[in-house]
Regions:
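Aromatic-anchored segments of alpha-helical transmembrane domains
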Residues: 12-16, 88-95, 154-167
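Membrane-helix interface segments
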Residues: 43-44, 75-80, 107, 142-148
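Hydrophobic alpha-helical transmembrane segments of integral membrane proteins
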Residues: 81-110, 170-171
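N-terminal transmembrane-helix/juxtamembrane module of multi-pass inner/ER membrane proteins
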Residues: 1-59, 99-112
């Protein structure tokens, strides 16, 4: 199951890359942002801003550090290395792709949060995906693996949707 999710993720990234300069995709992007802008509420604004805060790099480093401390106490050094290299590799790849594609962010009229740098790919979504994939890989044989899988997928999908909702990224 984890390999299927990785395949789906790679397929999604490939489709996104191919569609970056497609006028139909760009029209869809603008229409989606306008639709979300028209359906904002204070309640949803609060949820999405909260997700944006806990999905950034500082929070990701804190979560992974606490996880690694717990693993260190039980002498699971291989998993600590796996988590560390996954976070480092995913972040490096994401920032390289941002530099390579250098896609502009949506117009500031849609933004509910301050952003900087390129839009594609979303660093928040990369961090959420790396964390979700780590959790899925490490706990795939756990008694509650299906619930863990569902929550991990909900986390990275929610992060991606929240970044679009906040006007920080195109869909």
């Amino acid at each position: 199951m984890p390999y299927l999710l990785i395949f789906i993720g790679c397929l999604g990234i490939t489709i996104s890359i191919v569609g970056l300069n497609n006028p139909y995709i760009q029209h869809f992007d603008i229409a989606s942002l306008a639709w979300m802008d028209g359906h904002r509420t204070p309640f949803l604004n609060g949820i999405n801003v909260f997700l944006s805060h806990i999905g950034g790099l500082p929070s990701m480093l804190i979560i992974c550090s606490l996880w690694c401390i717990t693993l260190y106490q039980s002498k699971q050094f291989t998993q600590i290395l796996f988590i560390s290299f996954s976070l480092l590799g995913g972040s490096t790849l994401g920032w390289f792709l941002k530099w390579f594609f250098d896609r502009a962010r949506p117009d500031a009229i849609y933004a509910l949060t301050e952003t900087y740098g390129a839009s594609f790919p979303s660093a928040h979504s990369i961090y959420a995906t790396v964390l979700s994939c780590l959790i899925i890989f490490i706990f795939h044989k756990h008694a509650y693996a299906r619930i863990i899988l569902f929550l991990a997928c909900l986390w990275f999908l929610g992060m991606g949707i929240s970044r679009v909702y906040l006007g920080a990224h195109y869909p």
